[in-house]
């Protein structure tokens, strides 16, 4: 694997050994209705059943156990990160396992359910403005004040390696998989999965899915250079509002086969479709990948790409806010054959 990348497949293997005793082997489920809609065999990697309700515990726990080894005589005074919710919950849980305080910098606009969960796990919350710049600046200040270690939610190599363990499981659970579809925000999960898949089964496609309102990954691939979102994106998929970064971009640039963008209505309808037809309470961020596979654009993918695994990234749903958009979205034409 190219030396310019921040991690190698060996790092993913180490992460798997590092965390496997403390995480769930999440199931892969299927849906005959969604298969009919797409004309493909869909498999759903259910990270909503993971500890803390999302895939984020994989990277967070690997980071804490890698950056704070037991061999150290003096543990750091804290771990710090910025997060819209899921990474914050995961890092707090991981830090608690290792007996370390956690400080989480959270955008003021983060869903209440995620903020309350972070507090319930025992973290101290510090609020920031909903922009990448504010997140970074406040987190840096808190790290200095607490004499802690910063664990970036998607650019820390140990986090990226931890997220890559998803692909290790998928390739075992679905041996004939032709492609993985992964929602992308900062790109940690996408990069980790891409490194793993291309190391073990280079012929398997890795597709990214992101909201059209937060399409920095798509724009970066299109223009061949890093193109972060200029303004805080407005999307219901709060977990993918971050832009890809310097560590995830080279991997995504070289190893991700294609990127599919989806509208807010497509995300809402796909999320609701999974709720009602699969009985899985996914969050809208997890619905982004489903929306991508159901989109008109995805129909251009070769029919030889038959067996597709979609990573359902999490299930930390703000039920109160969901009431305001359920049933209100205009259903895309591709959904017309299913009554939702």
Curated annotation (Swiss-Prot):
This enzyme catalyses: L-serine = D-serine; D-serine = pyruvate + NH4(+); L-serine = pyruvate + NH4(+)
Record's comment on post-translational modification = S-nitrosylated, leading to decrease the enzyme activity.
**What cellular-component terms does GO give this entry?**
apical part of cell; cytoplasm; cytosol; neuronal cell body
GO molecular function annotations of the record? ATP binding; calcium ion binding; D-serine ammonia-lyase activity; glycine binding; identical protein binding; L-serine ammonia-lyase activity; magnesium ion binding; PDZ domain binding
Tissue specificity statement from the Swiss-Prot or TrEMBL entry? Expressed in the cerebellum, hippocampus, dorsolateral prefrontal cortex, and in motor neurons and glial cells of the lumbar spinal cord (at protein level). Increased in the dorsolateral prefrontal cortex of schizophrenic patients (at protein level). Brain: expressed at high levels in hippocampus and corpus callosum, intermediate levels in substantia nigra and caudate, and low levels in amygdala, thalamus, and subthalamic nuclei. Expressed in heart, skeletal muscle, kidney, and liver.
Which parts of the sequence bind Mg(2+) 4? 247
Q: Which UniProt keywords apply?
A: Allosteric enzyme, ATP-binding, Isomerase, Lyase, Magnesium, Metal-binding, Nucleotide-binding, Pyridoxal phosphate, S-nitrosylation
Q: Which residues make up the binding site for Ca(2+) 4?
A: 247
Query: Which residues does UniProt mark as catalytic?
Result: 56 (proton acceptor), 84 (proton acceptor)
What biological-process terms (Gene Ontology) are attached? D-serine biosynthetic process; D-serine metabolic process; L-serine metabolic process; pyruvate biosynthetic process; response to lipopolysaccharide; response to xenobiotic stimulus; serine family amino acid metabolic process
The PTM N6-(pyridoxal phosphate)lysine maps to 56
Q: How is its activity regulated?
A: Allosterically activated by magnesium, and possibly also other divalent metal cations. Allosterically activated by ATP, ADP or GTP. Competitively inhibited by malonate. Inhibited by meso-tartrate and malonate.
Q: Which annotated residues bind Ca(2+) 1? A: 69
Q: Name one Pfam family in it.
A: PALP
Cofactor(s) in the UniProt record: Mg(2+); Mn(2+); Ca(2+); pyridoxal 5'-phosphate
Q: Which residues carry this modification: S-nitrosocysteine?
A: 113
Protein name (database record): Serine racemase
Q: Which organism is it from?
A: Homo sapiens (Human)
Q: Gene name on record? A: SRR
